[in-house]
Amino acid sequence: MDNVVDPWYINPSGFAKDTQDEEYVQHHDNVNPTIPPPDNYILNNENDDGLDNLLGMDYYNIDDLLTQELRDLDIPLVPSPKTGDGSSDKKNIDRTWNLGDENNKVSHYSKKSMSSHKRGLSGTAIFGFLGHNKTLSISSLQQSILNMSKDPQPMELINELGNHNTVKNNNDDFDHIRENDGENSYLSQVLLKQQEELRIALEKQKEVNEKLEKQLRDNQIQQEKLRKVLEEQEEVAQKLVSGATNSNSKPGSPVILKTPAMQNGRMKDNAIIVTTNSANGGYQFPPPTLISPRMSNTSINGSPSRKYHRQRYPNKSPESNGLNLFSSNSGYLRDSELLSFSPQNYNLNLDGLTYNDHNNTSDKNNNDKKNSTGDNIFRLFEKTSPGGLSISPRINGNSLRSPFLVGTDKSRDDRYAAGTFTPRTQLSPIHKKRESVVSTVSTISQLQDDTEPIHMRNTQNPTLRNANALASSSVLPPIPGSSNNTPIKNSLPQKHVFQHTPVKAPPKNGSNLAPLLNAPDLTDHQLEIKTPIRNNSHCEVESYPQVPPVTHDIHKSPTLHSTSPLPDEIIPRTTPMKITKKPTTLPPGTIDQYVKELPDKLFECLYPNCNKVFKRRYNIRSHIQTHLQDRPYSCDFPGCTKAFVRNHDLIRHKISHNAKKYICPCGKRFNREDALMVHRSRMICTGGKKLEHSINKKLTSPKKSLLDSPHDTSPVKETIARDKDGSVLMKMEEQLRDDMRKHGLLDPPPSTAAHEQNSNRTLSNETDAL
């Protein structure tokens, strides 16, 4: 490119200047006068070996090619800004737009130039032109299209330019477009801003819709899960009611019922666990007919529950789980299969009966041989004395019935009727228990000694158990508010109320049992006492050798030793009682007769002419004790006979006994006499006096002085003890009397009598006014 004569050399200034410009011609001539002007180039000569021969096209016809391509793309062109209104200007415009008629078509590859090449500014918005800014000219045309209703004239011009039919040579239209270009740009910005706001709002609405759809799907899934759980619970309940479920767990572990959902892969933690809180951990549908909650660990037929036997033989018949007095082929106790008693058969003595719970290894070996029910009964009754109570295994439809089953409905299912004599383990497969959360009649905890080890429970001597059962039956009253003790109805659970207040000792003579058996309020614990029962068929009472009386002391009972005492009677009341340990001198239940429970946890006093309301049960009970003169807290100070309802009142009263009763003439008080004497001997007040025997206060504390001295002595007492004739004591009394008279402590002030008279007058006036 060093050689300027090179035909490939192109001056860059030609792209920015018009060839007709004088400055361009002068500059071009000055650079290299030997190079001819562009018009002098013989570009269309066929014999010339130039660019046409190499590329097969005219080099200077490239502008026409680009213009034609831009027209095919429907991109409008802008004329040169230097064009005017003259005819020469119109030619320049035509040359700039390069418009051809039908006879003069533009050919892309023709070797002959259709128009002379004039290197000028491109009219497209892509390559730019003079005065061009960063905003595309296309956008201004589009905004003018949007504002067609406001300014229709530019739209007509744009349509003409878009259709390429005619070109207006009047520059006023372009000036008009440039004038409206500012307004169009403002409107375009407003529209773009509104479009952006609408787009953002639309995106937010889409997000909200997606959240709502997700929440709806979650709700549908949750409802489906709940529906499945309800269906599973209904299926399990139907299986339990029909008795179709069988125990498939080991003894001592809760039963896990396999539902269809669990079989599909549900975890074991989600299994439905059937629990109970009965005495032996059994669970059955329907529940057994119990007269009242059991208060003993002893089994119904007089022998402890055989936990080891159930664990060793879990697959045996239900009657093998406990001592059954019936034939081995009978699985349940029916209404007609009741016990009959006769003296010719097995004897049962309460004193001679002993039984072990197979806790040692020797008893385990013996258990393997005792498989049949008859052998167990025979071996058990062999140990009884001949003078005991006899039980016959005969089963007869006319056998006598216990008074506990007289009110049983025969039309009821057999399992209801068997609930009194038959343990729970004989009514349904065993399901070991868990603690139940809901406290109802069937889930009341059994009364057990918490201090006794678990492995030692149910292993007491039967004589001791029977004695405890006698005590519980004689002490435990009927449930308040129940007219009879028929089988529990399917209604709301009854409330079991116990009052823990001091009670009287029960009668120690337990030989008279006839009123106990004939009483209508009996529980199933009294089944443990084997007594003659009236025979309905012969209408006579069979005589038996009298059983030795069982004496019972509630204060010495090992079973009830750790529990709070139970009352010997409970007076019916309308409000439930809470467990309180407040001492009282009144009979049990007396205070609660005057308590009325109101809504909003309020309590009203029912004492005549009182009707006070309290917020706490403790406060109303203390208030009623004041009405009834019940003051259990008495002062133990010598000579004091005061008593109080509450303990803190007694404590406050005792402080008054320890008041500072030793007074110095200066007005200072002391609790002890020796402290007063030491104070006076120091001569630091007006009442100071030098005594005959100086008293030196020890620097040690009172506790150390008591530990050092074997006897509780004081200097004053020692001085008085050394006085044989009493002269020192007389002198001390005279000095004290003189000092008190000197300070006016013996003679009352003259205004005291007048003050008492005035107070008496005011009291009399108040009583007259009332």
From Swiss-Prot:
Pfam families: zf-C2H2. One of its GO terms (biological process) is G1/S transition of mitotic cell cycle. Its main location: nucleus. SUPFAM superfamilies: beta-beta-alpha zinc fingers. GO terms for molecular function: cis-regulatory region sequence-specific DNA binding; DNA-binding transcription factor activity, RNA polymerase II-specific; RNA polymerase II cis-regulatory region sequence-specific DNA binding; sequence-specific DNA binding; zinc ion binding. A zinc finger (C2H2-type) spans 603-627, 633-657, 662-685. It comes from the Eukaryota. Residues 294-304, 754-770 have a biased composition (Polar residues). It is found in: Nucleus. Plays a role in regulating basal-level expression of CUP1. Activates EGT2 transcription in the absence of SWI5. Present with 538 molecules/cell in log phase SD medium. PANTHER family: METALLOTHIONEIN EXPRESSION ACTIVATOR-RELATED, ZINC FINGER PROTEIN ZIC AND GLI. This is Metallothionein expression activator. It comes from Saccharomyces cerevisiae (strain ATCC 204508 / S288c) (Baker's yeast).
